Amino acid sequence: MDHKEVVLLLLLFLKSGLGDSLDDYVNTQGAFLFSLSRKQVAARSVEECAAKCEAETNFICRAFQYHSKDQQCVVMAENSKTSPIARMRDVVLFEKRIYLSECKTGNGKNYRGTTSKTKSGVICQKWSVSSPHIPKYSPEKFPLAGLEENYCRNPDNDEKGPWCYTTDPETRFDYCDIPECEDECMHCSGEHYEGKISKTMSGIECQSWGSQSPHAHGYLPSKFPNKNLKMNYCRNPDGEPRPWCFTTDPNKRWEFCDIPRCTTPPPTSGPTYQCLKGRGENYRGTVSVTASGHTCQRWSAQSPHKHNRTPENFPCKNLEENYCRNPDGETAPWCYTTDSEVRWDYCKIPSCGSSTTSTEYLDAPVPPEQTPVAQDCYRGNGESYRGTSSTTITGRKCQSWVSMTPHRHEKTPGNFPNAGLTMNYCRNPDADKSPWCYTTDPRVRWEYCNLKKCSETEQQVTNFPAIAQVPSVEDLSEDCMFGNGKRYRGKRATTVAGVPCQEWAAQEPHRHSIFTPETNPRAGLEKNYCRNPDGDDNGPWCYTTNPQKLFDYCDVPQCVTSSFDCGKPKVEPKKCPARVVGGCVSIPHSWPWQISLRHRYGGHFCGGTLISPEWVLTAKHCLEKSSSPSSYKVILGAHEEYHLGEGVQEIDVSKLFKEPSEADIALLKLSSPAIITDKVIPACLPTPNYVVADRTACYITGWGETKGTYGAGLLKEARLPVIENKVCNRYEYLGGKVSPNELCAGHLAGGIDSCQGDSGGPLVCFEKDKYILQGVTSWGLGCALPNKPGVYVRVSRFVTWIEEIMRRN
């Protein structure tokens, strides 16, 4: 592995769109293509490399690779459809969309796919041969028509679309059955529509998916890389009947778009099943009774329940009779019921047996087995690491090792039986520098994992409150790094493999021009010291003195601060997906920010969250009985509600602040700072106005009502998916009652929810390497009822108010 992840400059360039010259390419970071027909050329930029691909005359250039460190460009005749891909550092693979596509636009004159059969199923004749038919159109006569192999083409601009000469002597030519691309029309419900329509049915301009104004939303392009949420184009990321968008009208949150249906049959959707596989989206069995015993309503009927999940709106979902189906990406097949009191329910479908655990079948972007935050590290190069981390250094989620989506690969448990390739956990099957994984982002093939190297001695726990440190000028000279080490100015000068570094000013054994003391005078490129001039996520590196290896990373440890890390428990949470109502007892002290709010001389009545040593966040409605701070006290570090054990802290409330608007949120100032211990650690506050992505897996905790089930009196936890407000406000759920200052979370089937006594408590979401407080438990229609998810105050909307109150007091 002689290359490295792409430099920050290139990453920023990629994120900005790369410009018009690269719009016709699909790019994948960290992917290396094995191509027999290739040419290596010099190029100062990605665009220059693309221009050389377009100008290539010795072969048809279908792809190119750009190596940023040595400004190397490789143009190639093959692409990922015809040649294998490996992972590599410091490379981005660009493939022409036209050669990856198996659909046609218009009459298909530019179709360059690999279909090689006619509509009637006859194999096509090669364009370069003269038997059984002498061709009028050949590669020699029409070199720009893409007449390769025996693939269907349209060299004469035939209005009926691509065709080919046939291998049947009795039939000279016939047309091919090529589906239309979803750029000017849509198949099915438009789940794969990729066009550029950006106005709603009533003519309102669409809001950009990357914008949170005028409407905040949870469909973030970075969290849904498979949904193609580009610009402000109409899309269908959530299983609606057709594409839609948020609008630029502050008074109209969202609206459907007017996309015409394609006239050709849709592409095949893969195998169908008579049993449950994954989420059951391809289930085509005849079960027509829900798990609770209700008979299903016919999909074509509007009684007793009116709905838009009709055969007309979902023509590809086989909504026949009253059979259980999953047309909209729910967690399992379901149906509307014939009981007017029960709108819908899930069905109990027998499993196919060997159900997959691949990431493509998870019901949320965040896998349930999340990266540990407590005491998870690797030794050596991490080949022996068998932890459960599944997050990369940039915060991306790992792809399951048994999955081939979105990245096909050969690092499978069968090929590497001793590498511990379990679930989507970070591993090092090929003796790389540290554990890594393939990512669930189609644009990034793989990344190193967000793991640290084990230290010789354990870090001590601070017993006094502190403020998170910012590295000072003195810190820069220490032989350790903060963050990605861009400001590291230590004197390490060997790579992780022990090879001495080449001096930055030298041109031997490796010539380079991008990272020199002259081009980067502020990057500290002195002598041959390890540095990170490009802000590489993987840390400091250097060119090596090994002529066979251009560069490698250095083994620079993270600096240890005396401050606590918010959102990082010392005890790893269970992260159990079971219910709070019904009981899933947490591991003691694994949610160390959870507090019990009590009356001065009474018991627990509400929850809350420690956000700094002196401050607790809770729900405003918890303080309705008294506005006097002296009426309340806070219990920290507890696991049992009634029997407070060793290490529990009991602190009075000195001040309370209720958010001045209608929001159900309040701040409590403690009479003395909490002592930060293994059992008492604050949660992190979110970025102001941050919106949690739809279906993000988050966690609620509390000592609330459990309806007499197991675990009463012990701190419980549950994993809940966030539900986008657009969905939560549907008539069948909460009917427009949820405001932009609130968020929904829960399982629509019911059974898992916060309840009485959990009010004011935390809803925390895992982000990269810590838990962030995104919600304050506020209200709900009953406890754990079907179709009635819990509602939480959206903390990010009040961060500015929170910080201002804390600063003034």
UniProtKB/Swiss-Prot annotation:
Q: Which reaction does it catalyse?
A: Preferential cleavage: Lys-|-Xaa > Arg-|-Xaa, higher selectivity than trypsin. Converts fibrin into soluble products
Q: Where is the signal peptide?
A: 1-19
Where in the chain are disulfide-linked cysteines found? 49-73, 53-61, 103-181, 124-164, 152-176, 185-262, 188-316, 206-245, 234-257, 275-352, 296-335, 324-347, 377-454, 398-437, 426-449, 480-559, 501-542, 530-554, 566-684, 576-584, 606-622, 698-765, 728-744, 755-783
- Which residues does this entry mark as bearing Phosphoserine? 596
UniProt enzyme class: hydrolase
* Name of the protein: Plasminogen
What GO cellular-component annotations does this UniProt entry give?
Answer: extracellular space
GO annotation, biological process: blood coagulation; fibrinolysis; proteolysis; tissue remodeling
User: What's the miscellaneous note?
Assistant: Plasmin is inactivated by alpha-2-antiplasmin immediately after dissociation from the clot.
